[in-house]
């Protein structure tokens, strides 16, 4: 059955990530340019956090209102660091896990992306959309 398939069949490999010292504007640019909603944060290859599109929206519009792109980038970089904005120690799934493992975690509804790790190192990411497409054969 598909739910017992390895998570490696569903996950995106080589996920787009940022390093803890990168500017917040880089996260914003990646989300806008790549059309993604979640950006893992790494120290070397070790997963240490994740930033979501909604995290950025909360601080971008909640605190800074309507700024043009460059002004907003400057304000974000001056006010926030990646480590301050990220959710630290995110829940993840092992690269040796199954589709069922990921579905159980994502099914709780607290978030929509799950970093995939080998030990502590980021090796992929799986989203609720990835799981739905896989299970529906889309």
Tell where the protein language model's regions lie, with residue ranges:
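Tandem CBS (Bateman) regulatory domains
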Residues: 1-14, 53-91, 103-107, 127-138
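Short, surface-exposed, polar/charged, turn-prone segments marking secondary-structure boundaries
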Residues: 12, 38-39, 45-46, 67-70, ...
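The conserved cystathionine-beta-synthase
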Residues: 18-35, 41-43, 83-86, 92-110, ...
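A glycine-centered beta-loop-beta connector
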Residues: 31, 39-55, 106, 114-129
């Amino acid at each position: 059955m598909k739910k017992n398939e390895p998570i490696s069949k569903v996950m995106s490999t080589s996920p787009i990530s940022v390093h803890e010292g990168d500017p917040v504007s880089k996260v914003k640019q990646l989300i806008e340019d790549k059309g993604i909603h979640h950006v893992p944060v790494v120290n070397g290859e070790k997963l240490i956090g994740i930033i979501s599109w909604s995290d950025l929206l909360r601080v971008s519009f909640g605190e800074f209102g309507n700024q043009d792109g460059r002004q907003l980038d400057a304000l974000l970089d001056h006010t926030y660091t990646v480590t301050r904005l990220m959710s630290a120690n995110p829940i993840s799934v092992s690269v040796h896990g199954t589709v069922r493992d990921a579905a159980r975690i994502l099914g709780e509804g607290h978030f929509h992306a799950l970093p995939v790790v080998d030990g502590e190192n980021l090796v992929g990411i799986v989203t609720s959309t990835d799981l739905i497409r896989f299970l529906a054969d889309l």
